[in-house]
Amino acid sequence: MKKSLLYLILFVAANMVGGAVALLLSRWEHFAEGTEVSMDGLGNLPVSIGVAMFCTYVVLVLLMWVLKLIPRPLFPRTDKSPWHAEVSAMAAVAFLAFALSLLIAPLHLSDGGMTEQFDAMKDNVLCLLLLTVVGPLVEELVFRAGVLRSLLQSRWHPLAAILTTAALFAVVHANPMQALPALVSGSLFGVLYYRSGNLRLPLMAHILNNTLAVLSMHFPEMESHLEAWPVLWQLLLGFALLCVSFFLVAQWWKKTPQRMVKQ
């Protein structure tokens, strides 16, 4: 349990440091000239956040490696699931992402301005790498290979450990629009990690999930077209895709033997 808290503390601290560095980068000319720093006109702040968080996360991974908080080897050699089972798992992630988008859109939840921030990041290479690769890697190291693994080793019931980790994963996303999908997708990533005993599959799933989100930012007309549908149609299609996702996860589960999470 104490080790789980350590992972969370390091993650929160890294995000706080990254945010502070981003603010410094975005207003550097004011600090350098000794003039008053205004919070107005922070148009370059999202990109500064992306670059700062990219660098901070790289440092966090190195620190976790030095402190031996990352499993070694990171991807242990185990008998892989049949390729078609893993394809089912990845398809489940894609269907789940679309389902959650349809089911949550009618709620009109606040995202705290995150959509605008991500939209501003989409053309910066480091920001794209942060959103699609580095971010998922760090979050999987912290929440699945970190918190979830520690809870399982502490003899927590697997379901309780998976749901607790997913809830923490949702909380750190800080706004309802992101937190609800994070709770559901985080549960799926936890199931993939628990059953396979390997970070490889949940990491691939997380990267796919975030990549789909980034692609949706590049093609906003697709989302606008779906949101123009009647709410009932959105909900029906969302629930249908959700059922397909659950079915595919069940198929993967049946074809994947239980493996112990490495201590």
What are these regions (language model features)?
Residues 5-9, 50, 86-91, 125-129, ...:
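Hydrophobic alpha-helical transmembrane segments
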Residues 138-164, 191-198:
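Membrane-interface helix/loop boundary segments of multi-pass membrane proteins
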Residues 158-173, 207:
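Small-polar-interrupted transmembrane alpha-helices in polytopic inner-membrane proteins
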Residues 12-16, 20-27, 178-233:
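Functionally important transmembrane alpha-helices
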Residues 9-68, 85-89, 238:
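Alpha-helical transmembrane segments in multi-pass membrane proteins
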Residues 40, 44, 207-263:
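C-terminal membrane module of polytopic membrane proteins
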Residues 31-46, 70-138, 149-154, 223, ...:
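Juxtamembrane helix-loop-helix connectors linking adjacent transmembrane helices
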Residues 137-142, 146-147, 175, 188, ...:
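Active-site His/Glu-centered metal-binding helix of metallohydrolases
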